[in-house]
Amino acid sequence: MAVPKKKTSKSKRNMRRSHLALGKINVIVDSHTGEYKLPHHISLVDGTYNNRQVVTKKIDTEEVA
């Protein structure tokens, strides 16, 4: 069974793990709705992407009546 020859210091261990940190999420403000959204994603509020209507919302008949 393989075992380490010498103890790895906290500094060496943390330097090895330095690239594992998560980066910040880039969030932008939607120009139409003013809501926050991820870049290059469809707006969840009105279903637009790049100033075009991509997704239309389903209207429930129970809500209208």
From Swiss-Prot:
One of its GO terms (biological process) is translation. Keywords: Ribonucleoprotein, Ribosomal protein. It comes from the Bacteria. The keyword Ribonucleoprotein applies. GO terms for molecular function: structural constituent of ribosome. Gene3D superfamilies: Single helix bin. Transmembrane segments: none annotated. GO terms for cellular component: large ribosomal subunit. Coiled coil: none annotated. This is Large ribosomal subunit protein bL32. It comes from Rickettsia prowazekii (strain Madrid E). The lineage of its organism: Bacteria, Pseudomonadati, Pseudomonadota, Alphaproteobacteria, Rickettsiales. The gene is rpmF.
